[in-house]
Amino acid sequence: MGLSLLWALLQDMALAAVPALGFAMVFNVPLKVLPYCALLGGVGHGVRFLAMHFGMNIEWASFLAAILIGIIGIRWSRWLLAHPKVFTVAAVIPMFPGISAYTAMISVVEISHLGYSEALMSVMITNFLKASFIVGALSIGLSLPGIWLYRKRPGV
């Protein structure tokens, strides 16, 4: 079991690094930091994969992975003299909930075309809320490390 989990984790990380690298190239990230964007995308997706494997739901796993991406991105930005968003935005994009959002929109189109049905409405609401919570978890998780690490005075 351990070896198959490790293989699945490495596969997940490698496949997540590809879109992170692609979006970093679309965002015109400097060439010297492209490997770090891919690595951070793979690490973040790998953390989410492990958290989900050990029983955490996808919303909380995405939140945890986004926090880790934010922390590593801030540390690397000081080391490589680049803005943290250079690393973090491209790294978090592979975790966006494309399937849930697509299923919700298809359900909306089917409701519009076929008429109301309780099953379609349930699918639409479930997938819309799931996608919304994942996007919210990613955005809040990505912003929290900056608030924690850059704050100079106490919050109270």
Curated annotation (Swiss-Prot):
Q: What does this protein do?
A: Involved in succinate export with YjjP. Both proteins are required for export.
Positions of transmembrane segments: 7-27, 54-74, 86-106, 128-148
InterPro entries with a match to the protein in the record: ThrE_2, ThrE_Dicarb/AminoAcid_Exp, YjjB
> At the top level of its lineage, which domain of life is listed?
Bacteria
> What quaternary structure, including any partners, is listed in this protein's UniProt entry?
The transporter is composed of YjjB and YjjP.
Report the protein name in the record. Probable succinate transporter subunit YjjB
> Which residues, if any, are the signal sequence?
none
Q: Name one GO biological process term.
A: succinate transport
Which species does the entry assign this protein to?
A: Pectobacterium carotovorum subsp. carotovorum (strain PC1)
Q: How does it sit in the membrane?
A: Multi-pass membrane protein
Which is one Gene Ontology cellular component term of this protein?
plasma membrane
Where is it localised?
Cell inner membrane
User: Which keywords belong to this entry?
Assistant: Cell inner membrane, Cell membrane, Membrane, Transmembrane, Transmembrane helix, Transport
Query: What is the similarity comment for this entry?
Result: Belongs to the ThrE exporter (TC 2.A.79) family.
Classification via PANTHER family: SUCCINATE TRANSPORTER SUBUNIT YJJB-RELATED, UPF0442 PROTEIN YJJB-RELATED
